[in-house]
């Protein structure tokens, strides 16, 4: 398809209307590359995908998926044996997570019958539970967790201990030499903890000067007592960076062999996102999937222009027996809009997009669409309007064939009316003989007679309301346009004498205008009747859908009730059989019956039992069972450590292998909890503390605020208390240490204000004493 028609009909604006519905970068890329297709099977494949996604939305109206970014550059870096950074690893992690969520969604689909097209997309997605588990060591904020490796955990523990010592030393100096300081708050310079010392006391505190204030009144000194500790922290930070780089390299090496498959997963996710976006566009714009006609038999029902805010719907029939439709009549009535609507509708359909029309519409497939629309006069070439249009027309006539659609706006305009009309008829006749479908607009009256007298050519016009003197923009197929100049002039106040005089000059055309006026009236009446019929059909269609849905629901309820009744009946019969067995034993013991009589009696009783109900195929029970059982690829929380991982394999003894960061663990069923799937469009929130649901007798939760800044500690305390209340905890411990008492005082004030707190107090001496507060909830 030539690029000129895409620009002329503003197809790029249609793409822009679909953009807001996309969630993935790959989906955006597919939309950017979207162009009309000419292969029937490719267009039909796109339409089948739209039909399938519509079926999914009937049962799952909120179907969505999480946003993903472009991992193409990251995969190319892996191919070049380069390691990925944290942002790139996070992007890959998100692709793996969305892959799993889509496969889980597909596996749980019920009451949906899909064609092979969408089935294939879901089935081509591959899972990598080991990789997914390893990437859990990087949280969604881009922080590499301590459990990524034992060495990293050890280094960070040492850093925290050293920093605690530094803070303790600094706090001691603040207490003992506070009068020498210009501020009671610790400062930081060049990455070192320093004291803001008054310049007059700079020699009283031994240490390294790192900075002086602008006024010179304050000197920032790193006390000698913490220099060694700070040096140790710097060394540990360097070790931490080295270990982080090693972890990133290890994760990159794990991903490298699977780069191609992961890239394909990203494409599949993006394509499903693109199909979903097309469906949402169709839903919001009342668009439909049209039928394809290989015989160029076009039928557009209530078709609308997609770029107009409040378009007027029109019917357009361009059957295989027609080669041209000529829209005659005055300007400003919407003739050009009809041209563009026909062209743009076919560009959309051949791009696999739904069209703004009613169900039952048909479109043709054209290898090329040409258009000469608007004033394309070339100033550089010093061409007149007529020359410019004719140059373009010549190019179109040379390039067009039977698989083309041609759109002419004001064919033959810009020159002598008689010659222009003759040229227009000659051009249309040439295209008619060559069997090339054409729609043309014109204001030449000569073309009305040409349309009536020539086979394969049909007249059309745009309706004009003579009462309001405004165009209605209604397309009237089969009715040539007529002039409304006399009627407009009369309503605007021109004298009847002048109008009658003018009419006397055009008596030869008056009969034709009266016939056209009558045809217009009949067409309007027919259209109104057709609209009423369509309204009734639409109501019937809605009623049928509602009845079908109700019928399906009743069938499901009936099946559920029958299964319930069978189970109850089986329980009753089992109880009866058990009781009868006891009775028969007693009778046999009493020798009141002969053995063969007992056997016969038991046989008769067993006849009362119904056949065993096979519930293995019950979809509801199967789905419930799936929800209760863990499976490979599920995200978990290791209860002993509160760390997140992924199940990778189930062992024969019932235990599970799980990947937690870079560590593989073997866990029993009661040593982990399944993580519930998060909603697709909501980003995962990082939880600072994992609090398990507990009752009054359950385990306690503990929050450690030691070493935190006051603001950070208060934020974590607030979040921790909220989580404890949400999880029904009865009691929690808050470790704040003794230190300067600032955080301890802040904790006390917070707890006093919280109405959900029943009581709180310091822990016993053997459990932390005044450095720990025990909180009991109401």
Curated annotation (Swiss-Prot):
EC number: 3.1.-.-, 3.6.4.-
Keywords on record: ATP-binding, DNA-binding, Endonuclease, Hydrolase, Nuclease, Nucleotide-binding, RNA-binding, rRNA-binding
GO molecular function: ATP binding; ATP hydrolysis activity; ATP-dependent DNA damage sensor activity; endonuclease activity; mismatched DNA binding; ribosomal large subunit binding; rRNA binding
Top-level lineage group: Bacteria
PROSITE patterns: DNA_MISMATCH_REPAIR_2, SMR
GO BP terms, alphabetized: mismatch repair; negative regulation of DNA recombination; rescue of stalled ribosome
One Pfam family in the UniProt entry: MutS_V
Binding site for ATP: 329-336
Key word Metal-binding present: no
Residue intervals of the Smr domain: 703-778
PANTHER family found in the cross-reference section: OS10G0509000 PROTEIN-RELATED, SMR DOMAIN-CONTAINING PROTEIN
Assembly, per entry: Homodimer. Binds to stalled ribosomes, contacting rRNA.
NCBIfam families from the UniProt entry: mutS2
Family classification: Belongs to the DNA mismatch repair MutS family. MutS2 subfamily.
Protein function: Endonuclease that is involved in the suppression of homologous recombination and thus may have a key role in the control of bacterial genetic diversity. Acts as a ribosome collision sensor, splitting the ribosome into its 2 subunits. Detects stalled/collided 70S ribosomes which it binds and splits by an ATP-hydrolysis driven conformational change. Acts upstream of the ribosome quality control system (RQC), a ribosome-associated complex that mediates the extraction of incompletely synthesized nascent chains from stalled ribosomes and their subsequent degradation. Probably generates substrates for RQC.
Protein name: Endonuclease MutS2
Gene transcribed to yield this protein: mutS2
